Amino acid sequence: MDHYPIFLNLHGRHCVVIGGNETAARKGEDLLDSGAIITLIAPDLGGDCEDLLQRYPDRAHHRAEDYKPGMEQGAALVLSASGHDATDRLVYRQCTRLGIPVNTVDRPEYCSYITPAVVDRSPLQVAITSGGAAPVLARQVRSQIETLLPTAYGRLAALAGRLRERVAAVLPTGRQRLRFWEQVFDGPAAESMLAGREREAEQAMLELLRREQARRDERGEVYLVGAGPGDPDLLTFRALRLMQRADVVLYDHLAAPGLLRLVRKDAERIPVGKRRGQHTLPQEAINDKLIELAAAGKRVLRLKGGDPFIFGRGGEEIEGLIEHGIPFQVVPAVTAAQGAAAYAGIPLTHRDHAQSCRFLTGHRRHGALELGQWAPFRSDETLVVYMGLTHLETVSAQLQAGGLPPDQPAAAVDQATTPAQRVITAPLAELPERVRTARLQGPALIVVGATVTLQPQLGWYHSSPNAEPAFPEHGCLRGEPRPTRHPAPADTEQA
């Protein structure tokens, strides 16, 4: 973050506004609305500033002279809207020397703080800022948020504030209170408030509080959530909602690290590994951990790359939950195969090239790779091999032994759907050498089939040659140094 967001309590505190123009009036009114006492410093005032003095006679004052050093003494903050560079620079230097927060309108170089665009549903407030880089964009974002937040949210927040101490007295643990408030804001109480029935909303809150007080079952729940192939924009709404609700998150290295920033800030985060052939926790230990945490009353998010039921061991994990009577939800996702194929421009099916598609795994429970058991492989189908990067030579050989010709089109899609995505295409027999030369970062999917020939014309996603790895913990091929990204003429490399 370029700036640390903070809300100041200015009730009864003195603030200085330098300038007597329309901008000074607008900024001064914002301060007055926040409960501040202001002094406008300018030889003359425009009509808007005069209006402020009349409407706020006890809290808005005028000092009819040009700014001089020392006039800012004792101010909680200073806002300069003089419109004169020399004055603005002098104000900034003086305030900086004295440690007084100062903002200069449209001059970010003369600011020690910035004023955001605000959506006001007091006591609920949303602040949006571009850090001074694009104020118009910040205002447009504010306009969009304005349409999403009903004005009744302010009354709902005020009602919650009035009941907060009562709730704290009845529900002693933070987890109980969190569960209660989530049900309030996502249930009948909120709906009643939005419909204008405030009395009914309060009754619904009190009834829910009585039920929660009587509740003795502190058993938690497990959310088995697919994180998708890597791009956070491909998350489902339900996945995002549960990520914000979880008390603890168990995640593997196939879930892009950027996704963890979308998890509730105070949620405990537990890495459980899972990169090629290496596991921070064995699968059995992960299963036991889910049961242990849920039995302790926690809402547990199991965040898995791709879809939990496609080579994600989701079935193994929920078997133990069922055995122990732990409630759970499964949230599907855009699969790694779907995401990689779509972003690489490789259709999985096509009327002219592939009438079927099969998903295979390059990783077996007991280590042995035996793709031949799924033979014969046909040239008019698309094969997607998960976790095949490490053993790509074996994958290539077994697919050829199963019926595919050496020149069958094939591709490796690395870090799919992220800015670091790379696509390597080559005949099946040559793909392992091409991938080794490219030193892919992983994770990667292998796509084999005639539809790969369409990639040059259908590839639409342009990754960044200098992008940082999207999965920095995933590592390189065994025994190889970590690659350094260098600019390339294109994000697709072909043999």
Swiss-Prot record:
Organism per entry: Halorhodospira halophila (strain DSM 244 / SL1) (Ectothiorhodospira halophila (strain DSM 244 / SL1))
Modified residues (Phosphoserine): 130
One GO process term, biological-process aspect: siroheme biosynthetic process
Keyword Ribonucleoprotein listed: no
Protein name: Siroheme synthase 2
Keywords: Cobalamin biosynthesis, Lyase, Methyltransferase, Multifunctional enzyme, NAD, Oxidoreductase, Phosphoprotein, Porphyrin biosynthesis, S-adenosyl-L-methionine, Transferase
Region annotated Disordered, chain positions: 471-495
Residues given in the record as NAD(+) binding sites: 22-23, 43-44
HAMAP family associated with the record: Siroheme_synth (MF_01646)
EC number of this enzyme: 2.1.1.107, 1.3.1.76, 4.99.1.4
Reaction catalyzed: uroporphyrinogen III + 2 S-adenosyl-L-methionine = precorrin-2 + 2 S-adenosyl-L-homocysteine + H(+); precorrin-2 + NAD(+) = sirohydrochlorin + NADH + 2 H(+); siroheme + 2 H(+) = sirohydrochlorin + Fe(2+)
Signal peptide (UniProt feature, chain positions): none
